[in-house]
Each structure stands twice: as structure tokens, then as C-alpha cells.
Amino acid sequence: LTVAAPLLRKYGLPATVFVATGYIDGGRMWNDWIIGSIKESPLNRLELRDLDLPDLDIGTPDLRRRAVEVLLPKVKYLPFSRRRAVCEEFARRCRVDLRESLMMTREQVKALPAFGVTVGAHTHTHPILATEPVEYCRTDIVQSKNTLEDWLQRPVDTFAYPNGVPGTDYRQEHVELIRSLGFT
């Protein structure tokens, strides 16, 4: 809101922000848990085999970057509940306490339309839809849509698939679900 939004308004440029509502007002997405934990850890090595992840040396900045590159794809496609548990345990093992929120607040989301920014839904918990039962996806998407409509006091009819790779991150049944929920 302090850098891009004023420029978008000044030059009349359209923009859309897709919001995963479960992380507003203090949340942290799974990838931010991994990156932040590795960045802040006082350790030089992580023992992770019992989490079905490789043990990793993280004693230098380069090793930490490589660890992130190794871990993100391994954790990304875990079902949401497993992914969350792995991230929380991972942060504990890294001996970090990640309190700082990286996401917008509800008030910031509500302010976006004043800058000409469209707000779209992006699920509530940002699951990889293809890894979850369709009914879970429906509930998560509806929660996001309803939350945003409540905050903005207007219809939310745009949606972005988490990660967005057809066939890998979502399937045709998810496309049909999105349409049935009134998204364009």
C-alpha cells in the first residue's frame, strides 16, 4: 500500500491481488515457515530424516539457500494438514520463533479497492487443490470468498489457483468447482 498502490492509482494501471485469507492479520504461509526457519536458525545442520526429509547442512549462506531449494519442492505437495505439521516441527527443530507476520492485515486488504486494485480469492489456507479431497477444496474456497466479501462489502468473482499449474496443482474438477461457486 505504500509503494505499488499509489503508483498504480497515479498511472491508472489495473491490478489484482489474490488473497489467501487464512494468513491475514498475522499468518505465515508454509514456504515462509521453511525460508524463515532456515534463515534464522542458529544451527549448522538439521536432522530431518524422521520427517521424510533429507538431513541438511546449513552452516553457510550458500548452504542455506540450497537447503531452501531442496525443501520447498519436497514439502509443497504434502496434504495441507501434513504440510502444516511438518512446517511447525521444522521451525521447532531450527530453534526459531517466527512471530513477525509477512502478510497484509484485514484493514490493508479493505483499503486496496480505493487504489483501484481488484481483490480476488486465492483460497483460505492455500492448499494444493490436487492433493486434497474436493469437498475440502470447496469449503476452503467458499471460506475465502465469503471472508473477502464480508470485508469488502462487494462480490468477489475472481480466483487464482494456488501455484496454478494445470494437472499438477489443480484438475478439471476444480475448474468446474470454481465456476459453480460464481467465479468468472
Residue locations for each model-derived region?
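Catalytic alpha-helical scaffold of carbohydrate-active enzymes acting on polysaccharides/glycoconjugates
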Residues: 1-158, 165-184
